[in-house]
């Protein structure tokens, strides 16, 4: 069976479903770069995330 995508009002669920596999469970980095405190360093590259989400 398919698992439902996390709701927009569940940011932790969205991170676990969409980001953690590459960026680590605590966003410490892994296959992808560390995202912890990323807001204070850079902006998300254009096209990486659908702005509607």
Swiss-Prot record:
InterPro entries: Cyt_c-like_dom, Cyt_c-like_dom_sf. Heme c binds at residues 19, 22-23, 44. GO terms for cellular component: plasma membrane. This is Cytochrome c-552. It is found in: Cell membrane. Keywords: Cell membrane, Electron transport, Heme, Iron, Membrane, Metal-binding, Transmembrane, Transport. Binds 1 heme c group covalently per subunit. GO terms for molecular function: electron transfer activity; heme binding; metal ion binding. Coiled coil: none annotated. PROSITE patterns: CYTC.
